[in-house]
Amino acid sequence: TALGRVRDEFSHFEYRDTREDLLRFLVKTCDPQRESRKLLNHAETLLFEYNDPKDYVFLRDLMTTQAQRDQLIKQVQSKCNPETVTDILSAEERWDDLLAYARRHTREHSFPRMIRRLRDHFPEACFDLYRKVVTNLLESGTGQSLYNSIASHARQMRDIPGQEEAFGQFMAEVIDTY
């Protein structure tokens, strides 16, 4: 019976959010021809509430025009968490968009991950971003946690290709100034 299939479908997802399971079930069962609006709504809800890049791919593939896909990218940047945004923009190779996003989100926990994805494409811009982050941290105070954060960012700066000389100069400035 249909009820039995629904029960079987949900039985192996008991540990997860029931709403998410229901939405995933509805996405699988919606007829794209007759229920395209419902399908889009359910797919959008999955992406923006649960932040799974696979949901982005599904939703993107439902879009029929480039303008719709561009609008979806804008929505992703405003509604998804930074980790998901990083994954999606990287997978889509939207490096300029990811760089702009990183510039606006330097205080995010995932900022180093964004830079790792970008550093081969924009080494100078990534180095400059890190320079600003480290300088701001140095000027914000003292303390062990602050020192650990600065050291972590400095290690990331050191790994940006082609910036070895600039890194050495910046570290010399840091030692002289602070």
Regions found by a protein language model. Name each.
Residues 1-178:
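Eukaryote-biased, non-catalytic alpha-solenoid scaffold regions
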